[in-house]
């Protein structure tokens, strides 16, 4: 019969090995994202959270991108107005403590981007004003807010696509 100590040692060994591999992959991803930001400092950096993105009518896969944290895609764009389309995803916690996965339909809008700045585009369950109030004003500048509703034409907004200028 296999000894309990041997089983525990094997489990701990496998866990330690997988931990080291995961940390190595994370470090490479962070290094790649940092290098990408540095080499594109003269452009507008757009951080996208979702899927099926296109920019100016071109699929995101045609752009040079890097992956960041939390499945974000980072793309460098020239300064100016850009048409951004995509399906945005977010996770919110309900009053009962359950995770709720939110997903928009295809949303398309124009955003004015300035070179040398970083922008995040994501879906939130609250408005920019509510976030500003909650964090007592310590939030990035919101460039654009697109309210989403469950029923077309409804005034009861349930989520927002917000473009924040991070830097």
Regions found by a protein language model. Give the residues of each.
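Short loop/turn and low-complexity linker motifs enriched in small/turn-promoting residues
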Residues: 1-76, 87-167
